[in-house]
Structures are given as C-alpha cells and as structure tokens.
Amino acid sequence: MAGYKENNNIDNNYIEKLVNIRRVVKVVKGGRIFGFSALVVVGDGNGKVGYGTGKAREVPVAIQKAMDKARKAMKNVPLVNGTLHYSIISNVGAAKVYMQPASEGTGVIAGGPMRSVLEAVGVHNILAKCNGTRNPISVVRATVEGLTSMLSPQLVATKRGMTVDQITGEE
C-alpha cells in the first residue's frame, strides 16, 4: 500500500495534494488492528505551504485529519517569478534535498513527494534532487524546511543595513 499517490483538490483557494497513504498495523493480544496513515501537502500556490500526517481506522478520516493539520501548519516561502532566489540544500534524517532555481520554461523537475510540495507552494521553474532516502515524510519535511529557511534579498539587505543592489552585487 505504500507508494506515491496524488490528489489535486482545490478547496478554499488551497491546493491539496495527497502524497502517501499507508496501511499500518497495531498488534495486540487478541490479534491485529488495522489502520491507515496519510501524508498531505496543502498550499495556496502563491508562497504558502504546509504538510500534515493523520492516522485513523478509515482512509477518508485519516486524510481529513492530515489536511486539517497541514492547514494549521502553513508557512511562508519567499519566491521570485515562480522560482527560488538561490540554491538550497536541506537535510532531515537521511533525506538530503537539493533545490536550484531554473530559468523560465524549465518546469518543475523534481520527483515524487518533492513535486507535490513545489507545486502546492507555487513554484513553476525549479531543478530538484533528493538523495539519501525516499521516505515521503522525510522528503516532504526536508523540502518544506529548505524552502522556509530561504531568505529574500530584501530581508537580508535590511538585516545587514545595506541596499538590495549592494547585496546582489549589481552596484
């Protein structure tokens, strides 16, 4: 049952993507209790993204719990013209994620769970690669942490007391 599944629903102006559903088992004295775990990514397509996991005895309930958690955990991502400001490397557990801005017309070149996060946040041109593990939860966490750790040139300039042109080297 483990694997990559995608569901595009636009609800309340949010893009909701179902990344993974797993059947989980709890072994007790009287036998086995089956349940389901869901991983969902929610974004507005304009620089906000969140992810959540939910567990329940039935699939729809697990998905709904995950979507509620994802909506509550939304974070801002600074984007420029549908891509990133600069290259990012992010690690979570064994997952190592590399993301690099791309020129217009490149598209989203990323695999599996990373693609869901990038499409939900509103990135249209990017080159991305995941190394180390293919665990969807770790890959989604690493991708979101990398995107949210990125700082815009305006923020860096104000922190340093400089202008954006001085930061980017255009002066």
Curated annotation (Swiss-Prot):
> Where do the S5 DRBM domain residues begin and end?
14-77
UniProt-listed InterPro entries:
Ribosomal_Su5_D2-typ_SF, Ribosomal_uS5, Ribosomal_uS5_bac-type, Ribosomal_uS5_C, Ribosomal_uS5_N, Ribosomal_uS5_N_CS, Ribsml_uS5_D2-typ_fold_subgr
Q: Which domain of life is it from?
A: Bacteria
What is any one of the record's Gene Ontology cellular component terms?
A: small ribosomal subunit
> Could you mention a single GO BP entry for this protein?
translation
What are the entry keywords?
Ribonucleoprotein, Ribosomal protein, RNA-binding, rRNA-binding
An annotated Gene Ontology molecular function: rRNA binding
Q: Which family does it belong to?
A: Belongs to the universal ribosomal protein uS5 family.
Q: Assembly and partners?
A: Part of the 30S ribosomal subunit. Contacts proteins S4 and S8.
Q: What is known of its domains?
A: The N-terminal domain interacts with the head of the 30S subunit; the C-terminal domain interacts with the body and contacts protein S4. The interaction surface between S4 and S5 is involved in control of translational fidelity.
- HAMAP family the UniProt entry points to: Ribosomal_uS5_B
The job of this chain, per UniProt, is described as: With S4 and S12 plays an important role in translational accuracy. Located at the back of the 30S subunit body where it stabilizes the conformation of the head with respect to the body.
Spell out the NCBIfam families in the cross-references. rpsE_bact
Q: What is this protein called?
A: Small ribosomal subunit protein uS5
Q: Which organism is it from?
A: Vesicomyosocius okutanii subsp. Calyptogena okutanii (strain HA)
